[in-house]
UniProtKB/Swiss-Prot annotation:
Protein name stated in the entry: NAD(P)H-quinone oxidoreductase chain 4, chloroplastic
Superkingdom, taxonomy of origin: Eukaryota
Gene Ontology biological process: ATP synthesis coupled electron transport; electron transport coupled proton transport
Family, as annotated: Belongs to the complex I subunit 4 family.
Species of the source: Guizotia abyssinica
Pfam families registered for this protein in UniProt: Proton_antipo_M (PF00361)
Entry annotated with the keyword Transmembrane helix: yes
Length: 500
């Protein structure tokens, strides 16, 4: 047990401090913006301090553990803890949310509610990544959905209500399977429910029952990741949402699905995962090709970036399915890498839309001339997304490749086929990303803009872009910075595996 409740403070602070937004004086939106940014910055500094001084990298066990009895009736506990798997996503959440609040500066309509919802979402996401009790994990998972639904339905494009309804139907449907899985695991094999994660990890289940649990959890996480064919909510949602919400969706929300797959499906149900991993590998390879091909046919800029996210999630799925140290480390690195790159691309797409009021690529052209800074940053992030050497995306995808090649679970021929199909996916990625940049920025097409004067990005937007670009370059040059966090935990997870 940790003496000082670091994690409780980190989880509760955003939503608690955010509730005071409604009592701030009515002096315009400036006070609300600065208050929210200060809370996010304080939270990020607290998280960084706690992890720097109280987290040991060489310890694969759960650290900073807090365990308090909450509801005596069925032994429900407030149990939080951090290990090598969750420390990266928690820091990513803090970083991206802080920049998303800065990106939300132009939001003026109902700005109190908007900023409160962003902070409530922050608490739910940190809580999901640090929960060590299955029911608490489910509660935090659901807590995060409500703010997202409201952010989607109240701020965004003309079809925002349709996309928000589609989002909530998909995710609520997935949550039913998650709740059934949590209760099934908790109630199995004892008179008293045991929702403690450590107890559940050491529990052995009959193979048939473990497969049922696995499928239930998998559906819940497949909606969030998203995995084909449960991905159709994502392009609609990204196409209509405000770009600060898109940053949180692409940067953090999708990563919760990947985290759940590793944390519950891999760690809790290793035998079932060993059985299903070849199917995950097949779905992952199909997803890379399908989403990349579909992205190429999208006219809408934000939908094209959304499909590129779906394609990149295929690499995470393949890394998880490889059941090797290398592959799983590559998947975790891809989670962090795409968190930065996806958030940045949506931010830059949104700032471009704010200026030219166009979202369809065939209506754009020549944007590089009036907006050279946005052009430079957009091109840089497009190149990092297509895995240019020296960028974080390249390292993550190469490590996933090595994970498949070194996997002992698969025969040589399937490994060759999967690697070949993944390579085709990597060839398709520059085709749709570079054609997007060409349609948007090059040429001399005169587009009809309400204001004849289009200004380039200001200091705030440059700060957000550069703040995301630095870790992308940093991880690309020195990936051990992220890999050192997870390598011991990955070995611990894979020590439970036997090959069937």
């Amino acid at each position: 047990m940790n003496k000082f409740p670091w994690l409780t403070i980190i989880v509760v602070l955003p939503i608690f401090a955010g509730s005071f937004i409604f009592f701030l004086p009515h002096k315009g939106n400036r006070v609300i913006r600065w208050y929210t940014i200060c809370i996010c910055t304080l939270e990020l500094l607290l998280t960084t301090y706690a992890f720097c001084y109280h987290f040991r990298l060489d310890d694969p066990l759960i650290q900073l553990v807090e365990d308090y009895k909450w509801i005596n009736f069925f032994d429900f506990r407030w149990k939080l803890g951090i290990d090598g798997l969750s420390i990266g996503p928690v820091l990513l959440t803090g970083f991206i949310t802080t920049l998303a609040t800065l990106a939300a500066w132009p939001v003026t309509r109902d700005s109190r509610l908007f900023h409160f919802l962003m902070l409530a979402m922050y608490s739910g996401q940190i809580g999901s990544f640090s929960s060590r009790d299955l029911l608490l994990f489910f509660i935090m998972w659901e807590l995060e959905l409500i703010p997202v639904y409201l952010l989607l339905s109240m701020w965004g494009g003309k079809k925002r209500l349709y996309s928000a309804t589609k989002f909530i139907l998909y995710t609520a449907g997935g949550s039913i399977f998650l709740l059934m899985g949590v209760l099934g695991v908790g109630l199995y094999g004892s008179n008293e429910p045991t929702l403690n994660f450590e107890t559940s990890v050491n529990q052995s289940y009959p193979v048939a029952l473990e497969i049922i649990f696995y499928i239930g959890f998998f559906i819940a996480f497949a909606v969030k990741l998203p995995i084909l064919p449960l991905h159709t909510w994502l392009p609609d949602t990204h196409g209509e949402a405000h770009y600060s919400t898109c940053m949180l969706l692409a940067g953090i929300l999708l990563k919760m699905g990947a985290y759940g797959l590793i944390r519950i499906n891999m760690e809790l149900l290793p035998h079932a995962h060993s059985i299903f991993s070849p199917w995950l590998m097949i779905v992952g390879t199909i997803q890379i090709i399908y989403a990349a091909s579909t992205s190429l046919g999208q006219r809408n800029l934000k939908k094209r970036i959304a499909y590129s996210s779906v394609s990149h999630m295929g690499f995470i799925l393949i890394g998880i399915a490889s059941i090797t140290d290398t592959g799983l480390n590559g998947a975790i690195l891809q989670i962090i890498s795409h968190g930065f790159i996806g958030a940045a691309l949506f931010f830059l797409a949104g700032t471009s839309y704010d200026r030219i009021r166009l979202v369809y690529l065939d209506e754009m052209g020549g944007v590089a001339i009036p907006m050279p800074k946005i052009f430079t940053m957009f091109s840089s992030f497009s190149i990092s997304s297509l895995a240019l050497p020296g960028m974080s995306g390249f390292v993550a995808e190469v490590i996933v490749f090595l994970g498949i090649i070194t996997s002992q679970k698969y025969l040589l021929m399937p490994k060759i086929v999967i690697t070949f199909v993944m390579a085709i996916g990597m060839i398709l990625t520059p085709i749709y990303l570079l054609s997007m940049s060409r349609q948007m920025f090059y040429g001399y097409k005169l587009f009809n803009i309400p204001n004849s004067f289009v200004f380039d990005s200001g200091p705030r937007e440059l700060f957000v872009s550069i703040s995301i670009f630095l870790p992308v370059i940093g991880i690309g040059m020195y990936p051990d910075f992220v890999l050192s966090l997870s390598v011991d935990k990955v070995e611990g997870i894979l020590s439970n595996y036997f090959y069937r």
